[in-house]
Amino acid sequence: MKITIFGAGAIGGYLAAKLAVAGRTELSIVARGAHLDAIKADGLRLIEDGQELLAPVRAAAKAEELGAQDYVVLALKAHSLTPALDQITPLLGQDTAVVTMQNGVPWWYFHEVGGPLEGTRLNAVDPGGKIWERIGPERVIGSVVYPAVEVDAPGLIRHVEGKRFSLGEPSGERSERVTQLAEEMVKAGLQVPVRDDIRSEIWVKLWGNLSFNPISALTGSTLAAIVADDGTRTLARTMMLEAQAIGESLGVRFPIAVDRRIKGAGDVGEHKTSMLQDLERGRPMEIDALVTAVQELGRLTDKPTPTIDAVLTLVRRLAVERGCYS
């Protein structure tokens, strides 16, 4: 089984290291810069459970060096997909499956979903439909990623907590390709449930991200602080209820109540969201996949999003001023 991880940052590097150490697959990564140089020189190192492991991976700067794969795991952020298309497509053979590990609403959302929106392309995450055309939604295996992982230094990945990667076909089918990949990941020591409704699980994670991420970026607050404050907690709750109405109109099942989801966020403690961390470090922010796409879904389903609209306007303006959004 030939697998390439495209984007070997924290999550991509962790998955690559786990699969490589298990030694059951022909594992390659596409990386760049100091990270790539370190991996080529010293291998990919993983710190997990107090131990440092050396993962034997093939690292390349260009996908052309690797050729067609059985599986390509896209572990880069959503806003990086379109610029990377020329690099990704050389990895795609006739039967290559593509595992999408981006946060937020996926570009393939309306593939094999049925109903009047079948085949709709979301401009917020796939401007001009380029990803849809060049990768093809028929290749996709959806996923929801839960591990907390850090890049401590170039070539050095540190696992913090969590080992679950949920997988699911857009159609809900338990196909041979998703089953085989899940089995390999489980043998590598990961928890990999195969879902018959991956969209609902995507929404439950998105539910918190679309609210807490922009609020944290706007206020500089941690999750615990946002939940402890009556004003910001109410703001997050209102955004979540607007999103829930959209999701339910699309057939999504929310297995927990909104207040329980908010409490869970607060219980995480003094944690800065990824969007706040990106803002502080001057990096591109995941605004479109986490917030703009939900607004677009609201327009498609005729569900009002006044609070989401207002927060989106503010966080987008802030990001532009800081050079974190264009």
What are these regions (language model features)?
Residues 1-52:
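NAD(P)+-binding Rossmann beta1-loop-alpha1 motif at the extreme N-terminus of oxidoreductases
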